[in-house]
From Swiss-Prot:
GO terms for molecular function: 1-deoxy-D-xylulose-5-phosphate reductoisomerase activity; manganese ion binding; NADPH binding. The keyword Transmembrane does not apply. GO terms for biological process: isopentenyl diphosphate biosynthetic process, methylerythritol 4-phosphate pathway involved in terpenoid biosynthetic process. Coiled coil: none annotated. Gene3D superfamilies: 1.10.1740.10, NAD(P)-binding Rossmann-like Domain. Residues 370-380 have a biased composition (Basic and acidic residues). It comes from Anaeromyxobacter sp. (strain K). Keywords: Isoprene biosynthesis, Manganese, Metal-binding, NADP, Oxidoreductase. Its EC number is 1.1.1.267. This is 1-deoxy-D-xylulose 5-phosphate reductoisomerase. It catalyses: 2-C-methyl-D-erythritol 4-phosphate + NADP(+) = 1-deoxy-D-xylulose 5-phosphate + NADPH + H(+). NADPH binds at T10, G11, S12, I13, G36, R37, N38, N121, E123, G202.
Amino acid sequence: MKRVAILGSTGSIGVQALDVVGRFPDRFEVVGLAAGRNAPRLLEQIRRFRPRVVSVCDEAAARAVRAEAPPGTEVLSGDAGAVAVASHPDAAFVLAAISGGAGLRSTAAAIEAGKPVGLANKESMVLAGELLMARAAAKGVPILPVDSEHSAIHQSLVGHNRGEVRRLILTASGGPLRCTPEAELATVTPERALKHPNWSMGDKITIDSATLMNKGLEVIEARWLFGVEQQRIDIVVHPESVVHSMVEYVDGSIVAQLGISDMRGPISYAMGHPERMPLDLPPLDLGRLGKLTFEPPDPARFPAYTLAYRALELGGTAPAVLSGADEAAVAAFLARRCSFTGIAEVCADVLEAHVVEPVRSVEQALAASEHGRREAEKRVGARAHAPAGR
């Protein structure tokens, strides 16, 4: 029986992780849950899984949960609450799935507490990947990726000598706008950009998929998770989302992981590692699928992913600033205050204006991300009030 804590339990990944837990009640026990403000969903999870401790993002939500939670459930709030769940002494595994930079402190706390981490919060690696991997190595803590691409790379590295890796190849679906002409992208609506053809995800990551910023952030994540320089990490667009990523070795051989587009696959791989669990999911029928297609990404239409390579080149706080700027720009797009193409333009402006510093602490990384967010919000506001034709 593995005792688990799930951070971000009411989000897309958290809900699917609890679905996996529910399928294997003899393998997992939930000891802690951390959520945002969705008190009704958290209460449903509490009643079903009976965790010992839960946390929500603020005290108002905590009061609502305390009023209805079963006796014996400790209800905490804020960053301190999420950190307490992540470092709970009874947790033997922590699934880190809080979206955005908000998940960094709790992910770092799990590592410091010596907990194996299933990492679904890529922003933690983007903001402070070098720092977190150094602490994980010092603590002897395994970090198992939950992103489908990084899970695929992890699986494709098993049994191989990492010194023989030539490059990592991250696949991208291309998102809902892959075939949209460049001239139409500026007028794309949030509703259209949110219609992902293959994956069921939260709004922010779905927009990042549409801009290809998500793939750029995954390049940064892969840089630190696998210790491979960005010059040896490539992106290929693969619309079917069947090949989840690949590893090319020095002899030219390519090892890939294939599967259906269902996040419960990589979630169960991380949670059950080193064992695989028999999931009752539809099989991948390659004969019926017929073909797999691949194409290079188009930096002219989707320049956002190139900013991640630029951020790694700049180093230090640059990736954290880019991540914060992207969070603000995506939020502005969803609120109809920024155009679709404006997301990458705002992020590029913020990144190039940033004065880079080395990342020495989690708090410094968070401050850099917040700086990126503020600078992006300023630019969104300035663009909204710019004279027509400017």
